[in-house]
């Protein structure tokens, strides 16, 4: 009798799967004309699909020529609009190629928000401009705060945008000048003066800063200069293009030990670079999970591919203003929650201290240690070490101290030693 129960449950499970598959096939047949049309047509050359008609309530136009000329095309399954309901994050994979280059390369396309978030953005703009939830965005944008810097305003100042997003939670003038000078959605980039931007470009800059500042992070801290972010390529309407890096870090969760050690070392090096660098900008990662990093297939390099939640603190400004306890080392508190990718932090403290261990804590807790949980797994990237390393105990001790320190300022020392130990292990196994 007991053996029949799992058998029946198994049959029920298979029946449900077949029913779901059958429903999907029926939907595909019902939509077959539009399905065939979407398969054959390059929708990335369609102005309305790109939502170019919503500019200047958009992210830019620097890549419009490439899109509209058909140089960017969805990869196979990306052509099926019927599957868009599964693509909650509105992230697509596509192929891009210049005719004169003769080849094509993979790129990632992002709308920078879900359909719901984008609809809420439109409603917010309309309500602020007209008091109604629907309107002509082209007419409404000049009547919102995104147009406050139009005209003869010389600089983008902290007072104008402070708190709009994580990137500018506590902006310095030096950071904002960098954002404007490196803004890629204008032909006249290179100047920190706002008056060198068109009114439409200023509104696009401010809207991006408020809605999802990831493009501005990638532009201001570019991969070409050694920053560990994906390369920004351009935008058209509400579609942003970035370079495809490789498979997400999660796909390496069960990779050979040697590979995982190398990736862990790189992650700790990223934490160090973003915390301490010659530019004296501290870039704190507020959302750290396996999905937010990717690994290059050729060079094996770890890159951050989701930079929406990055807080930038200007250490020079902190030293200059000397807020209360500015020179006291800040230790992040361990958060033993039952959810995935938990982090505990205070944005106000991150903005007011020169020495902060947040990035070490985030990487150790959410990616490397036994406390890291993701998609139903636990143990972190460094799970199941070889017997000799497990027996030695040093790795586990460093990871525990980096995650939940028992000594005062223990995480700072543990992170330093962990970087050295991982470097030693990775060199030994190469």
Swiss-Prot record:
Gene Ontology annotations of biological process type: cardiac muscle cell proliferation; negative regulation of smooth muscle cell apoptotic process; regulation of phosphatidylinositol 3-kinase/protein kinase B signal transduction; vesicle targeting, to, from or within Golgi
Role summary: May play a role in cardiomyocyte proliferation through paracrine signaling and activation of the PI3-kinase signaling cascade.
Tissue: Expressed in heart, brain, liver, spleen, kidney, lung, thymus, testis, ovary and muscle.
A single Gene Ontology CC term: Golgi membrane
Alphabetized PANTHER family for the sequence: DIVERGENT PROTEIN KINASE DOMAIN 2A, GH11358P
Domain of life according to the entry: Eukaryota
Record family assignment: Belongs to the DIPK family.
Subcellular location(s) per record: Golgi apparatus; Cytoplasmic vesicle, COPI-coated vesicle; Secreted
Keywords: Cytoplasmic vesicle, Golgi apparatus, Secreted, Signal
Main localization (coarse): Golgi
Signal peptide: 1-35
InterPro entries membership: DIPK2A/B, FAM69_kinase_dom
Source organism of this protein record: Mus musculus (Mouse)
Protein's name according to its UniProt entry: Divergent protein kinase domain 2A
Gene: Dipk2a
